[in-house]
């Protein structure tokens, strides 16, 4: 923007000539042409506002016309609102010094959120970790047990434990041969009186145990039971006694 000594044209309005003369009296000789228009607009708005306020004050005082006292009061009130400057620095320092001399109030113990007592607050862990017990490689394995007691006439029934789940690692086991073991137990029947030896037939009972329950080997338990053919003679001892008496008479 170019600036220089501006002179209003001779055919300019009277208000523009007056504003140019005011700027010249204040020592302002270089300005843009639009400055005069802005100053005229500002002066018109300011004068209109002052006259409106003076009219309000005059009507409040119940005066028939607006006089100079009303205009002075309106200018004084408008000057306090429109043309204000910040207070001096020394004045602000004095006010700040007086404020800082006043100690701050103590912090209240119940400041912040009102929490219940500590025993009702979940501010600490209320649980305990339980360590897991690791099972060894031999734990949980079933071991076959055979109990040998007194020989009786009744065959003993082997008891098998309840199968349990055993975790097997994902490894390929080496091939192994499955062998079977045979146990032969001969159980003679109980006799109260000596009798003559009579050929008897032997009944064999085989009991096969599942290998998955006891181990990699199959165990075959064989029980031999001697059945007597002269059960009728033992059941009727009087008849046998009569036969022996007849033999003695013949002799």
From Swiss-Prot:
Gene3D superfamilies from the UniProt entry: Histone, subunit A
A GO CC term assigned to this protein in UniProt: transcription factor TFTC complex
Keywords: Acetylation, Nucleus, Phosphoprotein, Transcription, Transcription regulation
Protein's cellular compartments: Nucleus
Residue positions, PTM N-acetylmethionine: 1
Modified residues (Phosphothreonine): 159, 174
UniProt cross-references to InterPro entries, sorted A to Z: Histone-fold, TFIID-31, TFIID_subunit_9
CDD domains with a match to the protein in the record: HFD_TAF9
Phosphoserine: modified positions: 147, 177
Positions of region (Disordered): 229-251
Domain of life: Eukaryota
Subunit structure comment from the entry: Binds TAF5 and TAF6. Component of TFIID and the TATA-binding protein-free TAF complex (TFTC). TFIID is composed of TATA binding protein (TBP) and a number of TBP-associated factors (TAFs). Binds N-terminal domain of p53/TP53 which is essential for transcription.
Family: Belongs to the TAF9 family.
Biological role: Essential for cell viability. TAF9 and TAF9B are involved in transcriptional activation as well as repression of distinct but overlapping sets of genes. May have a role in gene regulation associated with apoptosis. TAFs are components of the transcription factor IID (TFIID) complex, the TBP-free TAFII complex (TFTC), the PCAF histone acetylase complex and the STAGA transcription coactivator-HAT complex. TFIID or TFTC are essential for the regulation of RNA polymerase II-mediated transcription.
PANTHER family linked to this entry: TAF9 RNA POLYMERASE II, TATA BOX-BINDING PROTEIN (TBP)-ASSOCIATED FACTOR, TRANSCRIPTION INITIATION FACTOR TFIID SUBUNIT 9B
Protein name: Transcription initiation factor TFIID subunit 9B
Taxonomic source organism: Homo sapiens (Human)
